[in-house]
A protein has these predicted regions:
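C-terminal amphipathic alpha-helical interaction region
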Residues: 441, 451-544
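Extended, charge-enriched "interface" segments that sit outside catalytic cores
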Residues: 1-110, 544
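Internal helix-loop-helix
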Residues: 81-170, 217-219, 416, 423
């Protein structure tokens, strides 16, 4: 009852108490497909436990608290001493501890680790996307650190630990550590070769002093950072610890925290280096080459993060429409709403399937799979992150006015949705990276064609899309102006090939018709009415 004025009816129950992993049929199928059979029992148990935690009222409340109480910068203590600390709400630390404890930075430590971790990361993004940032950077720092055996021995066991220690202490005193990275500067943005931060060698081999700044430095309370700076031989990668071996704070000077559209639980800082101690990682002048694997890993996490946000939004929309009645029946049963939900579910599943396939390529590690990643990761990062915002906004509209209210959780998803398209290089950077791979690494295109070729002959619309892509690539003159179109086609063809091979026929048919065959519109809810829309929606229901 609501006082004596009316009875509250026709309001869907909150979507809580369910297994976020186990109720996601597309994600479960992808994990089962890519993991070796002997790994499945353990992975099922771990992912279901994480999924149940993610769907719990407690963790969802922590997510709200972490976003309603954003981080706060403290540059000095009460005596005027420089401390450069960021205070987070306790809910942030609880969530981050859960994420680290679930192995979301430990993909490198066990067989099938990338697929297992990718599924977990996709689930975890649906709880609170902000703490995905330090989890992602910590996970991604491992391959860069492994270029230096001494640094790897010191740091990698701590980065891949399942222990979260929030206190800033020397690395040698910690069982677990988090990592960040800093590349962007005011004058350059994505053009890191324009960086002006300088590195002056010290007497001890491999050590330097940095002078300069970074314009965006997320998760600034991490234990260490990989940064790019100009050494005597050119742009070089460095490790900057927050705390030095003797326990003193490094000169890591936090200037202010960014006021951001979304990602409010996570701190993104402007930082200055003034006599900042650093260790070189890799050779001088090879900074981009050293850090490139870290960038590739975080770009894949942008794909997974966007897939997670889409799944969260679609699950809320389908759940709402399964309970809400209007015009004589459930919204779920209204033909037009069913079309909208089916279209959204299709986009969500395509993103999930693509993200898990790329994670499986990371587990494989062979030359063929690495070549595939070289072209597929930037294409996927370009396309999936671009699709996230329209999916989330349309899903929020399915809730009507309720979806515009903060308590629904949908506004937080909307604010978060554009971020992954900006992180680790915006859309143009990704599209141009696809072109770079085509020109410099012909084996990447060969690996891609071999991958999508496994589905040839199964659907005429997919076959035609592959042919059209090859026609597009036949002449790369003026390709820069077509780079987005090319990247989009790469992503769609790869998604289509995976769905044709592995998804239920109704899913593959709908994707090929609307995304490859031209039988769809510019907005969601324009699928051909002859498709099995009910099956698509039922597959997406987050059944408790």
């Amino acid at each position: 009852m609501a006082g004596s004025t009316h009875t509250v009816t026709n309001q869907p129950p909150p979507l809580l108490g369910h297994d976020v992993y186990g109720t996601d049929q597309a994600l479960v199928a992808a994990v089962e497909r890519h993991l070796d059979p002997e790994l499945l029992d353990e992975a099922r148990g771990e992912l279901s436990a994480l999924g149940r935690a993610a769907g719990s009222a407690q963790l969802q409340e922590w997510a709200v608290q972490a976003n309603e109480n954003p981080p706060r910068l403290r540059t000095h203590d009460r005596y005027g001493h420089r401390i450069d600390e960021v205070d987070f709400h306790p809910a942030w630390h609880r969530l981050l501890g859960k994420g680290v404890g679930a192995g979301l930075t430990a993909a490198w430590t066990r067989p099938g680790g990338h697929v297992r971790r990718a599924a977990g990361f996709l689930v975890w993004t649906q709880v609170e996307a902000g703490n995905g940032c330090p989890l992602s950077m910590t996970h991604a720092a491992v391959p860069a650190l492994r270029t230096d055996p001494e640094l790897a021995a010191e740091w990698v066991p701590r980065l891949t630990s399942t222990i979260y220690e929030r206190e800033l202490r020397p690395a040698g005193q910690k069982a677990g550590a988090l990592f960040g990275m800093g590349m962007t500067e005011k004058q350059g943005g994505s053009d890191v070769r324009a960086n002006t931060t300088s590195a002056r060698p010290l007497a001890e081999a491999g050590t330097y002093v940095l002078t300069g700044h970074k314009w965006f430095c997320s998760a600034p309370m991490s234990d260490g950072f990989l940064v790019l700076a100009q050494a005597p031989e050119g742009l070089t990668c460095f490790l900057v610890p927050r705390v030095l071996e003797d326990g003193t704070r490094n000169r890591f000077l936090l200037q202010r925290l960014k006021e951001k559209l979304g990602n409010r639980s996570n701190a993104s800082a402007e930082v200055e280096f003034d006599g900042t101690w650093a260790r070189r990682v890799g050779e001088e002048g090879r900074g981009v080459r050293t850090i490139i694997d870290m960038v590739a890993a975080t770009r894949l996490d942008c794909v997974l993060g966007s897939a997670g946000l889409m799944r969260a939004a679609v699950a809320q929309a389908v759940h709402h429409c399964a309970y809400r009645e209007a015009f004589g029946g459930r919204l779920l049963d209204q033909p037009l709403m069913r079309n909208v939900l089916a279209d959204l579910a299709l986009e969500s599943e395509a993103a999930t399937v693509l993200g898990l396939r790329l994670a499986a390529a990371c587990d494989d590690g062979g030359e063929q799979e690495r070549a595939l990643l070289r072209i597929a990761v930037p294409a996927a990062k370009y396309w999936v992150t671009k699709r996230c915002t329209p999916v989330v906004v349309e899903a929020a509209e399915c809730l009507g006015g309720n979806g515009y209210v903060e308590e629904s959780g949908m506004p937080r998803l909307v604010r978060e949705s554009p971020l992954n398209s900006v992180w680790e290089g915006a859309g143009n950077v990704q599209a141009l990276d696809v072109l770079r791979a085509l020109r410099r690494e012909p084996q990447a295109l060969n690996a891609f064609l071999q991958e999508v070729g496994r589905a040839r002959g199964a659907d005429h619309r997919l076959d035609a899309a592959i042919k059209d892509l090859l026609t597009e690539l036949a002449d790369l003159d003026g390709a820069q102006a077509r780079a987005r179109r090319i990247a989009e086609r790469f992503a769609l063809v790869l998604q289509g090939s995976l769905l044709v091979r592995f998804a239920p026929p109704e899913v593959a048919d709908a994707f090929c018709a609307s995304r490859l065959g031209g039988d769809g519109g510019g907005a969601f809810g324009t699928l051909p009415h002859t498709l099995d829309l009910r099956a698509l929606v039922e597959r997406a229901r987050p059944l408790a």
